[in-house]
Amino acid sequence: MKTLVSTSAAPSSPLYSQGVTAGPFLFVSGMTGTDVRTGQLAGPTIQAQTAQALRNCLAIVEAGGGRLSDIVQVTVLLSRPEDFAGMNEAYAEFFPTEPPARAVTKLGVELPNVLVSVMLTAYLDRV
């Protein structure tokens, strides 16, 4: 059985669910660095956008009953490969110890001024 997870603390769209639980797993859709309070990107830098994208993802995890330590896999999509080091700076602050599994690849669509998108999976051990 699947359950949709949503929160006003992260960007949303009628085209996708912010998160979906299936069994003990919570799948979070790709989130950009958009700040829902302003409707704008958190800033022009990869660090600012990565940090905000991760905060958006965490808001969805928390709405689904999880927490940061429940995140088991992260996929980061970069618009520009040269932003890899800057993304890692922000990522390391978010996951300073015991980071989840991760993949980094190129973002396949061009979104104006968007440097990064993050999607992830959390394991919600409710047993």
Identify the role of each PLM range.
Residues 1-55, 59-72, 78-127:
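N-terminal presequence-like segments and the immediate start of the first folded domain
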